Amino acid sequence: MSEEIVQRLLQVVQDLYAETASLTENDSELQLWYNRGYADGMVEAMQKLGYSAPLETAGVVVDRSLIAGHEFLPWGKAYRHGFEMGEKETGEVL
């Protein structure tokens, strides 16, 4: 069961990364920033819980520089909130 859940979560991460591939430093795209943060939070939770191997196999890598210096701007806040929720909810599922 857990392997199936991990694969589903991995697909969600990949879908969110594809959706947010063209992020710009623009507060008009707050939902995209939230979604990218959510995906990164999911990855963080999966790594902490010992699921690094499927992430590495899929080539999923969090770009930690993406938000650096923008934490207090509107898109940085949206990203951070998404990250926190993605990490929390993934932890609850796994």
Task: Label each region the model flagged.
Residues 1-5, 27-30:
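A ubiquitous short alpha-helical element
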Residues 2-19, 35-38:
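Short amphipathic alpha-helical heptad-repeat segments
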Residues 9, 15-18, 22, 48-61, ...:
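N-terminal processing/targeting junctions
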Residues 17, 34-38, 42, 79, ...:
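Hydrophobic alpha-helical segments
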Residues 21-34:
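Charged, low-complexity interaction regions
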Residues 32-67:
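Acidic, low-complexity, intrinsically disordered interaction modules
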Residues 59-94:
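Amphipathic alpha-helical binding modules
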